[in-house]
Structure formats: C-alpha cells, structure tokens
C-alpha cells in the first residue's frame, strides 16, 4: 500500500483529530509511546491585520494546519514510481506536487498540506502560459469531479500524509480539494466546479456514491468543502444553493438541510428558513427530524422564530407529531431564550402549555416501546431543564405562570414543571410548596393529577420522585384537612406506581407515626399504612421487618391508634396463607400483647385486649377452599376438639385474654365489642380468606350459653329498691308459629332491671356486657348460618323486665316522687333498654322474612317512642346523673376532659362534676323504699327538628345493617302511623330516625366528624369507610324516591299557601317532619358525594353506579354507557330543580354543597362536552336566589344567630365566586340604594332580607374580597387591549364600596374597607403603572378622571386613619404604617410618570387637614382609652361567625405577593407625621 522500495511494517492508518498529532512508529523494531500534542493557540498573531481578505483564508488555514500537524518539513525523498502515467494536466500537477493517485482509497501526500499548497502555487506561477494552464487544470478538475470518476471520493475525503524523513504516517482530515481552495487564484474556479457538481448530483434520481472500497455518498462530501467559504462567498453560495435546493430530490434536500449550518453564513439563515417554508407547505414535511435538528442550530431573527413557532404549534397539535421528534421541536422553541425578552418568554410559555395540554386532551393514547418513550420523555424535559438553568427570566416566568394560571388550566404539565423548578433551584422550594399548598386548599389540584402524571410523565416523575416525596412529607403535617388528605392519597397512588420507592414511603410513614407532637398526624399515618397493607399486601409483606420498630411506640398511642397499628402488625405477622409470614414479627407481637395483658395499668391492659383481638382475627382467617357452609352447623365441644392450626391458636388466645381480664366489666365489654367489630369486617376485595369454620362453631356455642345464662330470664319479676318490675314490650305474639313455640317465647325476657338494681358479682353477668355480648353473638351466628339469625330471632321481640309505671300517662309525676338514687337507677334501666333495643334492631334489620321484619319495625317504633318519653325524665334527672356508657374505649380522665367544653353555664357546671358510673359489679345494699305519688302537671315536650338528641341523650349507635330498612321498606307520609300500618310501613318518625343515624355515620366516615362528647368513641362502622360507602349504594335509589315523595308534598303545600313562606301551615308538626326528612335526604347525598376517595381511579366504577342510581329506573339501561362526567351533569341538573322545595336555610346550604360536589365529580375526567362553566354559573345564580329569600326557623320565627350567619356566609361566597365586573357593579348599585335602611333598628335589606346591620359585614366582606380576587386574577392575564379599562372599572367598584361604608357607619366595615383598599393600592403599584404609562400621552384627561376617582378613596382612608387614631381603635391603627408607605410610594410613582411626560396638570398634591369621618377637624388626640376595644366587639354575641376565619381560603388573593398583615406598632414611616394624599 505504501512505497515499495522501503521496508516497513504494514500497520493500519490512524485517523487523527485536527487539534492533535498522533505519531505512529515507522520501524517495527522501534518502540515509542504514542503522544498527543496539544495544538498551540495564538498562532494567528503572525498574520498581518492588513492582509487582503482573499489571502487571509490561506494564511489562517495554513496556521491551523501547522498547529495540527507539527513542524513542517520539506521532503527530500524522490517521488515513487507511479503504476501509470498521468492522464491529463490535472493529474500531472498533482503528481508533481507530491501526490500519489492510485494507492488505496485516499490520496497519499509526500508532505503535509502546507508544502503541497506551496508546490501547487509554484507550479502555476512558474508556468509561462498561466491562464491557459489554469483553464486546462479546471477542465481536468471538472473531469475528476465527475460522479463516475475514480478520483472524486479521494479528492473530497481526507488524505494520507507520508512525509519523508519522519517516522510517522497519519490520516489527515483535510481533503485535497481543500488544498485547491487555499490558493487564491484557483478558488473561484474550484468553487464554480464544485457548485456545478453539487447541482448535478443533487438533481440525480438516485443517491450517487463514490468509487472506492467503501463508497460514500458524494453530495454530503461536496457540501462539506464549502464550510470555509461561508464568509468570502456567502452570497454566491446561497444563491446557487437556493437554485439547487429548488431542483433537488427529496433526499438531496435533506443533505443540503443537514449541512446548512456549515455552508451558509449566519446572515443567510433567515432566508434559508423562508426557502424551507416555501418548499414545505406541509408542516409534517417541514418538521423532518433532520430539518428540526438543523433549525435548532441556526441563528434566526425574532420574526423568523415567531413564524416557526406558529408552524410548530400547528404541527404539535395536529396529531402527526411523534414522540421522538417532539423533544427537538421543544428545543427549537427554547431557542427564543437567546432573545430573552418578557414578551418572547411569555409567548414561549403559552406555546409550551398549549402543546402539552392539547396532546393530553385530544390525542389518542399510543402504545410505544417503553424504552423509546422513556428516552424521548427524558430528552424532552432535559431540554426544558437546560432552558430553566440558562434563563433566569424563563425560570421566574414559569414560576409566576404556575402560580397564577386559572384552576381549570392547571394540568399535570404544570405539576411536573414545578418539580423541575425545585430541582433547578432548591432555594425556591418553600415558595413553590406554598403555590401547591394554596392550590390544593382551593381544590384546584386533586389526586387525579397524579393519575394524569402517571399516564403522561411516568418516567420524568420517577426521576424527580424524591422531590415530590419531600413535599408530600411536609403536606402530611398540615393541619388543613384537604392538604393532608391530598398527601395521604398521593402516597397511596405512588406506592402502586413505583416499586422502587415503596420502602421509602413506608419509612416516611413510620417516621410520622413516631411524631408525638400531633396525634392527628399519627392516626393518619397509621390509617394509611393499614390501607396500603390491605390494597398491596404482597408489597408490604416484603417490607415486614421495617414495621418491627413500631412496637416500641405502641405504649405512646391512644386506644384507637392502637387498634389501627395492631391491625396492621398482626395481619402482616399472620398474613394470608398464600403469603410468607414474618416469623420475627410474630414473636415480637406475641410478646408485646402478653406483657400488655398482665399489666395493671388500665390503659395498657386495654391496649393488650385490642392487640389480642386483632391477633385473633389474623390467626382465625384461613384460605377459602370452597367448603360447604353447612358444615358450620356442627358443634365443637371444647378447644381441644379443634384441629391444630391457626384456628386453634386463635381459640386459645381468646381463653387466655378472658383469663387476663378477670372480673373487669369494662375490659370484658371492650373485648366483646372489639371481637364483633373485627369479625364483622368484610375482606372480599382484599383477601380470599374467611374465618375458620370450626373456630366459629366453637365460639358461637360458647357465647350463646353465656348469654342465655346471664341475661335471659323466665322468673316472675319482683320489686327491688321499692320499684315494681314487670314484663313489658313483648311483641313476639306477632309471629305466626305453633303453640308450643309461642308459649316458650312469651315466657322469656331480658332481665335488664334486676341487673341494674341488683347487680351480680361476676363481670360476665354485668348489665354493661349485655349489648356488646349480643353484638358478638349475632356476628358469630351470621358467620355460622349464612347471615341467618332465625335460631335466635325470639330475642328480637321478647319481653323486657321494666318498671311498671313507665307506660302510665302520668309517668313523669311518678318519676319525680322517687328519691334521687331511685331516679338514677330508673334512668339507667331505660338507657340500657334503649341500647338493647338498638343493638337488637340493628342485628335483625337485615333479615328479610316478613314476620321478623314486622317485629323489627314494631320494635323501631317502640324505640322512638321510648326515646321521646325519656326527654322529660332527663330534664328532671338529678344533677349528678351520668348516662351508662355505651362504649368502653375512652379513659376516665379523657372523658372528663372532653366533657369540659364551652357551652351554656348550667350544662358546663353539670358536666364538670359528673362522676363515672360504677362498673365493678359490686352489689349495693338493698333497702325498701316507700313511694308517695303526688299530683304533677303533665309535661308536653316540644320536638326539636334541628337536633334530634340533646347533650344528655347518649345512646349506643345503630349498626350499619340498619340501612336495609331504607332499601326494602315501604314509606307513608304520616308521622303517626295507624295501628294497621305499624310493622308494615315506615312513617316520618322512622324515616327521620334512620336518616339521622346514617347521616351521623357518613359524617364520621367522610368528614371525620366524631362525637364531641366522646372524641375517642367506639365507631364500628369506621373500620373500613369504603365498605360503608359500598353498603349505602343500594339505598340511594330508595332515598331518592323518598326525596321525590317529600318534595312533591312540600310543593303541594306551598301551592296551597300561595308560596307565602311565613304561613303558619308550614310550621305544623306533620309538615315540619316532612321538611326535616327532606333536609336529611339532601344532606345524605351531599355527604355521600363529598367522599375524598372518589378521585381515586379504583372507585370510578362505584361512582358510576352511584350516579346511575339517582336516575329514573326506566333509563338505567340507556344511561349505563354514559361517562362519569355525563352522569354527574345529569345528576346536577336533577338536584338543581329542588331549589323551590327548600324551606330551611340548613337544607339550602346542604343543597349547595351537594351541587358543588357533583360539579367537582364532573371535572374528574377531561370531557369537552361537559358544560362545567354553565353549571358553575347556575350554582352562582342558585346562591343568589337563596340569599334573596327570607328564611324561617321550624318554630316559625325568623332564622338568626351564629349558625345562621355561618350558613349565610357560605351562600355569600358561592354567590360572589367568580362573578364578573358587570354583576359586581349591578349588585353594588343595588346595595348603595338600599343600605341606608340598615341604620333603622331591626330593619333588613330589601333584596337580601336576612341581612341586618349586625350581620351586614358578612355581605360587605364578600364584596371586598371578590373585587380584589377578580382583579388579581385579571392582572396576571396577558392583555393586548386597553389596559386602563380594567383599573377604571375596579376604581368604580371601590368607590361603590366606599359609598356603602359612608352610609352604614360600622367599625367592622371600616376595617374591611381599609384592608382591601390597601391590597388594591398594592396591586396598582405592582401591575397598574404600566397601564397609566400607556395612556398618559394618548389621553391625559382620561388619566385625570382616573386619578380623581382614586383620590376619593385615599382621602377617606386618610380621614379613617385620623379618626381611628383619635379614638384609639387599635385594629385600624396597626394598618396605618403600611398604608402610609404604600400611598407615598404611589404618589411618588405617579408624579414621576407625569413629570416624564410633561403632564403635571393632571395631578395635584396638597397637605390635608386631619379630620374625622364627619369632616370635623381633629385638633388634639383624645387621652381617653374608652374606645380602644377592637371593633369586632361591637358586633352582637350571635354574630361571632363574622370573623374572617369563617371565609376560608378560597377567596384568597393569588397575585399579591406583598404582605398585608398589620404592621408592628413600633414601625415608623420615613415621612413626616403629617399625611400627604392626592
């Protein structure tokens, strides 16, 4: 391959970099190290600045080559003998210059490039006929550059340098053609030949390749030769390239585009892009991958980038843009950051948001390779991250955009963008967290956004998951329930999405459980851990050992927290049989519960009981192998008869726990309640395990015997403590059975009175164990007999041993003649009776055979009647009487603390001294009391339709099964059923009772509203709230039917009274029950659809069924295929029609909440057909209609008070939410005309009859806040039109508020007006000055009018501050420094603006005299502090809800970053004490 006269080893050639020299040893026996010599910089200093431009090319290129190749040496070696003679003058010149033409695939040079160029120049300059020689050379070059020539690829590719006298051979990157271009007199001819050949090749129908062992496409090689001529021949090159491009084939065009950055001067880039736009009218053709990559490297003007941005948007939103090319389009868009102006950055963000939002709402999801998808997604956001790093203005604009974008436009892209912002600059993490926190509070962001991120940005989320986890960890600690719920649901979703972070999530949750500062946080973390274990048992089981340290924290937990923690630990220690158990955790749990059981401290022993129950449940659940359930009936004599296994272990643990409990009645009752709760839980959705059949049979026989022995009696009642007892309330005769059975049934009774009056020593015989034990019995029987309780149905209607006088008409008189101790015993008897009836009714409510159902309804009627009859007795009860406990979880100290709550003074005193009932079971001494009955007035108790139970009526909650009565029972519109209707129908009393119970359970499950008297109360239905929601599904249709019936009754009555809402017929008992039941139905639906888990995708099917149930049954089949948003829309329109049937303010508010929840459910999915904006407007109109009605209490009096104000406040917020300037102006105009009437005592507004002067600040505050809220939202939107128009309308509205303040002088209104005026002025300083600048020269008179209107406000503020200082009103004085500073800044800015535009006449500033609100001069401040109290104290006592905390956060200001808190009193303004206003 090389010269053949010299021996050398044939080593492969080394391709070198232009900036380095790689030396290769010539002799094989010589060993030298390869060295890389860095090129020297500063070689250009030897080139004269005065050298001609045409000569500088040669000089610069020669210097580069010299630096690259090292010291230039002349070759003393003779040229090798060629294998052939030169064919033409062109080849002869090359040979003479030292070029070998036919050796391999490249030209071999006898020396480096600079001597070659020198020899070529010498050959031509020394020739006699210079011009002819040049033409001959050009002809030969033209022939050599022909596509079919063997030399063309050699001329265009790098040469091999074999310099004589040097032990090196290297491959140069410069071609021979580049040597020709270095000679000034040859350059133009060579360029001409090159461009002609480029055109020839580009027009060819096929891709022309070179003639070499490895042929290469010729067009890219030819184009590369032009890269050093872009400055000297830019016009010529572009003009020819333009012609060539227009005539080239598609593949040739792509080659030209790919090399455009190198061959075209930067000044020609805009013209080239215009050429592309002309040639590619289709955006799909224009944005080829090659084109996009080239466009990203070109230097383009603003105008060209704007045109490209439009086409990019069209292409990205056309559905033709692939995921692979999108990152490069985004990179092309980000090139605008080179300009980095406010307008360009704003347009860029708008374009980015438009592209991402369109792709996620309109584009059908494509299935692509996961690796390709991951690569393109990471590449895309990598470009965005680089843009955020490169441009501070872009970073800040993205931050502001995410903070101010409307709620409807906040998408998963914005969420990812915020995570990127934190990643780029962690210093801003607190500010960005606050953005997210505020949006979550306002419910702009729900957990559904994580589902969107999982679908669209899974890979980038995984990259930034640590950042998100840190944010969620902080959000879990939030006191705001919405924020903490968001974090909780987010953890659950992330746990299912990413396996890699499951351990981290568990560790963070375990960390939160150890936080002693917040019990609520601990409870929430424990509940979330239990939820994760239920939904992802296998994943949690893999991390079982992480949970062991939780056992060390058990002693610090409350009893309810212990229940959740032990539920988690026990079911991980003893998981489903198909999962591997954690033996280490089993040993630790067993050891801990044994220690707790033998502990003498009551609370720790209860923890041990709760732990044992959870352990029993986990052990007793075995795999369901499809065994016939009839085998359950078989009896098991004792524990030893049970087969070895987990069932026998559970039975032994029950015996051990009972032995540890000993004679503690409270602990035994708690044990039975806990067992009933855990055994009653359903695990169909999370586990395939059921309780062991033989274990159930053993436990069932055991507790049945105990119950019969302790509480069922057949003895004749006797007189105890002077109280005559007898069998009462026996309804078993209603059962149609044979004579023998009936006689047996009629002879038994529940011995409640005897156990109260003469308690037994054993804890198992205590009256307090009656209800818990029966609850446990019925759960076991349902498991054993396939939900049938037929074998124990006699207990439902059997007699109860009660005092004989209770059925008398004068029972109150008889009760009052007893001694105090006897009265306590009698009341205890009836409390236990009510609790027994509640637990028995709940047990049999799910039984469907007609005789049992009749007894259930009859017993329910008796229960309601007894509870009503107890009300007058409780009113006359001894002061120290305490109702018997219905739950046994709360400690004594905790109970006393909970009872010390604010309220009426007598009740507070009563509750503070209540002793705890005796649960020891010790028998008191029996004495014979004589009774003297005297005359007493009959007492008629008035029904409270607002609150069903008073503070002393603490009854056991009904079980969940009670809802079956709502599903399967007929309803009649009577509050007192006829005799033949009893046992067959539900009346208004029964319906109200059932709805009230279900609503209370829903509040506990959905809103976590627990009993204020028993904060740690036993709530069986709360074990799994989702189960309760599922249980309610069947009854939705029936409750809706009841709602229709009640609504029709209300409408008919309204028609009869001609819609006069004050008519006395609307306040009769019968109609009040109808109104109460109607309100409870609406409240039930509102709570049901307020469940936070509806946003979880796993609940979508349940939500769909729930919404379908509320449609007419005839349309169910047709509507089955409707989406959730469509069904929510139909349901919204359905409930909206009930506005006319609402007669109570509380019902009106619950209807508003229901519609808000349905509106939110309609927004869970993206559905373009969903008319959400119209629904929001309908909701606003509804609130306005409700506010303009006069509301009356059930008693017929005008509704008022603190609760009324809270309801009115909620309607005001709904009415003013998102109202525009026009509606605000109309409302203000209306109020300005009417507000003067408020100065008259007890007069209300004509348009809003529920607002008097006392609660008018509610409405006024709403007007102030909606003005600032709407203004702050509009100033952040890009407005290209008249910017001053917005501020003119805002000042008009502010002056309307000023007019109201001046007419209705109320301290509360003064403070509200000052606070929001200060916010307005700060907004004007931040965003309004540009609007003033735009109008100052065009229309000075308009600016004058604006300043004049603003002057009215500032003058009043000045007078208000002076007046407040004179009367020492500290609430307003605290705002004065901040207000003074803001006004002075505004004055300075306005004066500077006018001075710069020579418009001084539009502004005048003078020193104002200090005056009070009535215009009188204030000479000296008053020394008295009589008026120093806060203005809030002037409001009446029933108006405490007017405080600003009631309003919440949803009317908060989004764009005002400057703090509006009252300034510190010590802060001094820099100006003089004399105020200056304009």
Swiss-Prot record:
Q: Where is the composition biased (Basic residues)?
A: 1468-1478
Q: What Gene Ontology cellular-component terms does the record carry?
A: condensed chromosome; nucleus
Subcellular location field: Nucleus
Summary of the knockout phenotype: RNAi-mediated knockdown is lethal at the pupal stage of the life cycle. Conditional RNAi-mediated knockdown specific to eyes, thorax, wings or nervous system gives no visible phenotype but increases local sensitivity to DNA cross-linking mutagens resulting in increased incidence of mutations and chromosomal aberrations.
Positions of the region Disordered?
Answer: 33-53, 896-918, 1420-1478
Q: Which Pfam families match?
A: FancD2
InterPro entries registered for this protein in UniProt: ARM-type_fold, FANCD2
Task: Give the UniProt keywords, A-Z.
Answer: Cell cycle, DNA damage, DNA repair, Isopeptide bond, Nucleus, Ubl conjugation
Task: Please note every region of biased composition (Acidic residues).
Answer: 1429-1442
Cross-link Glycyl lysine isopeptide (Lys-Gly) (interchain with G-Cter in ubiquitin): located at?
Answer: 595
* MF annotations from Gene Ontology: DNA polymerase binding
An example Gene Ontology biological process: mitotic intra-S DNA damage checkpoint signaling
Sequence ranges of Low complexity compositional bias: 35-45
Purpose of the protein: Required for maintenance of chromosomal stability. Together with Fancl, and probably Fanci, involved in DNA repair of damage caused by agents that induce interstrand cross-links but not agents that cause double strand breaks. Required for S phase checkpoint activation in response to ionizing radiation induced DNA damage.
Which family is annotated? Belongs to the Fanconi anemia protein FANCD2 family.
Tell me what this protein is called. Answer: Fanconi anemia group D2 protein homolog
Gene name, per UniProt, is Fancd2
